[in-house]
Amino acid sequence: MANQVIRCKAAVAWEAGKPLSIEEIEVAPPKAHEVRIKILATAVCHTDAYTLSGADPEGCFPVILGHEGAGIVESVGEGVTKLKAGDTVIPLYIPQCGECKFCLNPKTNLCQKIRVTQGKGLMPDGTSRFTCKGKSVFHFMGTSTFSEYTVVADISVAKIDPSAPLDKVCLLGCGISTGYGAAVNTAKVEPGSTCAVFGLGGVGLAVIMGCKVAGASRIIGIDINKDKFAKAKEFGASECISPQDFSKSIQEVLVEMTDGGVDYSFECIGNVKVMRSALEAAHKGWGVSVVVGVAASGEEISTRPFQLVTGRTWKGTAFGGWKSVESVPKLVSEYMSKKIKVDEFVTGNLSFDQINQAFDLMHSGDSIRTVLKM
């Protein structure tokens, strides 16, 4: 099948705001420096829902969404040397070419090699590998895992341990890696420190896990949904609070609880007002606040400059700061050796045909991650 078009099932988003439609699509063979992957498991993430809602200015339709997946290489295009058919892989929405100035700088993981075409929903040569009913269908985040087969750039693939369970490690393609890395890479949480985590969804739980692994002595979880508190404590939160239980601002509450503020705070929602609260809950002189959640396009953050003048640091993170191709295999190994949790993030499994139900579960707040088995 290597040089053949493959016909398979995919969940196509024909237009914004409508449920996904399971369709038969054609997936063209990989061109030079591309890899065609048989996806075996994929999860549903808020970023998929954000684009589907129509709020994403980079959103193009029709499109095949999905960016938390895992599978097996079916075939490779010309010039691909590091991957071969049969390899077990995780597609990556942040590539690692190893050559651009971003890849060569140890301070960042934001490879820019294919950023422009990826943002337009196209492969690096400016075209799509997907067609459905005679129409070209856009790619998404360079991954498009809501399809039985997908084509990705060879710099957007992590080769992983073939014994890893794909219906679990697919989550390392986004949420878990993002939250865990926000704590250990971006904030560089220190042993004995105090942390506050705003938003206790999948990413927030991964931040808590990262703070715990880094040796934080006190981790405060913050969410308006108290149903999430028990799970947060399982992951390592020392205590959990809801802003709705207090008459004063949540930052004032935290400053009082912690004798001046926390050493590290993390915003895992994408709400600019909460980002401000997280910064202002950080300790004067040394507190660090990390923006992990992605706010809607056009939103702006604000605080009084005095907050920064008096020694607080405001940072942001994408994919937890991990250089993707080299780091994801290591994260899989950390999971296999039980250093990090993954299974505990999976709150349910559904068949691929039930993908819209997985979105409903996510919106209800009742699930952390639902994994679809292809």
From Swiss-Prot:
This is Alcohol dehydrogenase class-3. The keyword Ligase does not apply. Belongs to the zinc-containing alcohol dehydrogenase family. Class-III subfamily. Catalyzes the oxidation of long-chain primary alcohols and the oxidation of S-(hydroxymethyl) glutathione. Also oxidizes long chain omega-hydroxy fatty acids, such as 20-HETE, producing both the intermediate aldehyde, 20-oxoarachidonate and the end product, a dicarboxylic acid, (5Z,8Z,11Z,14Z)-eicosatetraenedioate. Class-III ADH is remarkably ineffective in oxidizing ethanol. Required for clearance of cellular formaldehyde, a cytotoxic and carcinogenic metabolite that induces DNA damage. Its cofactor is Zn(2+). GO terms for molecular function: alcohol dehydrogenase (NAD+) activity; fatty acid binding; formaldehyde dehydrogenase (NAD+) activity; identical protein binding; S-(hydroxymethyl)glutathione dehydrogenase (NAD+) activity; S-(hydroxymethyl)glutathione dehydrogenase (NADP+) activity; S-(hydroxymethyl)glutathione dehydrogenase [NAD(P)+] activity; S-nitrosoglutathione reductase (NADH) activity. It comes from Mus musculus. Ubiquitous. Keywords: Acetylation, Cytoplasm, Lipid metabolism, Metal-binding, NAD, Oxidoreductase, Phosphoprotein, Zinc. GO terms for cellular component: mitochondrion. Pfam families: ADH_N, ADH_zinc_N. Coiled coil: none annotated. The record marks R115 as: Important for FDH activity and activation by fatty acids. Zn(2+) 1 binds at C45, H67, C174. It comes from the Eukaryota.
